[in-house]
Amino acid sequence: MERSQCGSRDRGVSGRPHLAPGLVVAAPPPPSPALPVPSGMQVPPAFLRPPSLFLRAAAAAAAAAAATSGSGGCPPAPGLESGVGAVGCGYPRTPKCARCRNHGVVSALKGHKRFCRWRDCACAKCTLIAERQRVMAAQVALRRQQAQEESEARGLQRLLCSGLSWPPGGRASGGGGRAENPQSTGGPAAGAALGLGALRQASGSATPAFEVFQQDYPEEKQEQKESKCESCQNGQEELISKSHQLYLGSSSRSNGVIGKQSIGSSISEYSNKPDSILSPHPGEQSGGEESPRSLSSSDLESGNESEWVKDLTATKASLPTVSSRPRDPLDILTKIFPNYRRSRLEGILRFCKGDVVQAIEQVLNGKEHKPDNRNLANSEELENTAFQRASSFSLAGIGFGTLGNKSAFSPLQTTSASYGGDSSLYGVNPRVGISPLRLAYSSAGRGLSGFMSPYLTPGLVPTLPFRPALDYAFSGMIRDSSYLSSKDSITCGRLYFRPNQDNP
């Protein structure tokens, strides 16, 4: 009775709504007994078949809305969604929080989700609502994915249909297709029917077009691969020819005909195996050195040109070094030191027992040896002492040079006969009380002035006339400053060696 009154009032106020002809239901199906519809509303048939889960939630919402609204306004129809009843009665429906409704509280859902009192409730009703929400969210996501896939399939079908219609008719078929569009805009329903019919016709002819396109595509791809492989091989041949020319130029000076034969063999190997870059020297792989990695066809197809260009440049850089034979150490020394006599360099090399690096160090350090039969006994001692530059430091205002040496015992002697004598090194006076080991192993300017300063005051050591800031050129010889003052000018610049060495 209430339904008929509400329907008559709606009909009197607003009349029958004017809908588009495509949306009007010509013969509505009989409503289900669980879903009565007001007689004054025209509803699409898809809206009349909601899922049962949605119906139960709508019934609960309608009951809650009826309890809160009281007798004001038109009560919603029992069993119908509250949104439909609200639209029919003229006021919009605001969504409510289902968890609050389970606990007897009505609260609007907008901005309420974070501050809901029962957001973490685990009762039976709230868990049921959470499960329903999860199922609904999964359904919505699935429908969105299906709609997206359908739209993509339609776009692909349109592309295939346009690809089919262009080659035979050319522009005319395209123009005809554009001319058919105005006919399809006569009405919404007619346009939809024409669109569906065209899609059905296109779906029937879409598979052969796609097959033809798929057959043509591998041929084009194969042609592209072959052209890329040919260009890559041409580039490799050019680079390898350049590297062989460089190698030929370097090996013609050293090896002559042998280099040409190795180049010919490597070129023949490369022509036999064009898919990979071989090393120009077959013996290089057996010798233990790493050969450049071979290029597979997948690298050539994928366009990895940068890697094989790097490999080719590396092989080109290593070609001259590999081709060079072991050189004579004496030739190396003569090329490094062209101003030195060959016999002199040969003596230094013999003294260093054939070690080129040690011989170069000896020449650079200024150690020139002229070994004779008389000095063979002293050669081992001379080998142990390295001639290094002495670093100068000051002790309580007195500057003298520390004697840098590999051996701690040879540079300093503490005998009393050494003071003032010209047959030995200028030793430190025993009065000073300095251990020669500490003086020899001490570093310049780090800790010597601290432990030496109490002993080297002018009052304690008045008899050590060290020359300030002396810079000794060699560790095996030293200038006698006290002896220089008493000798004449001929012996002033004389250098005193140890007793076991010959004076120059």
Curated annotation (Swiss-Prot):
UniProt key word Transcription: yes
One GO MF term attached to the UniProt entry: sequence-specific double-stranded DNA binding
Pfam entry (one): DMA
A GO term from the CC aspect: nucleus
DNA-binding region in chain numbering: 97-144
Highest taxon listed in the record's lineage: Eukaryota
Region Disordered, annotated ranges: 1-27, 170-192, 266-307
Compositionally biased intervals (Basic and acidic residues): 1-13
Key word Cytoplasm present: no
Compartment annotation: Nucleus
Effect of R342C: In a colorectal cancer sample; somatic mutation
Domain DMA: 327-362
BP GO annotations: male mating behavior; ovarian follicle development; regulation of transcription by RNA polymerase II; sex differentiation
Entry-linked InterPro entries: DM_DNA-bd (IPR001275), DM_DNA-bd_sf (IPR036407), DMA (IPR005173), DMRT (IPR026607), DMRT5_1_DMB_dom (IPR046472), UBA-like_sf (IPR009060)
Comp. bias intervals (Low complexity): 293-306
Keywords: DNA-binding, Metal-binding, Nucleus, Transcription, Transcription regulation, Zinc
UniProt tissue specificity: Expressed in liver, kidney, pancreas, prostate and weakly detected in testis and ovary.
Family listed: Belongs to the DMRT family.
PANTHER family from the UniProt entry: DOUBLESEX AND MAB-3 RELATED TRANSCRIPTION FACTOR DMRT, DOUBLESEX- AND MAB-3-RELATED TRANSCRIPTION FACTOR A1
Protein name: Doublesex- and mab-3-related transcription factor A1
Gene: DMRTA1
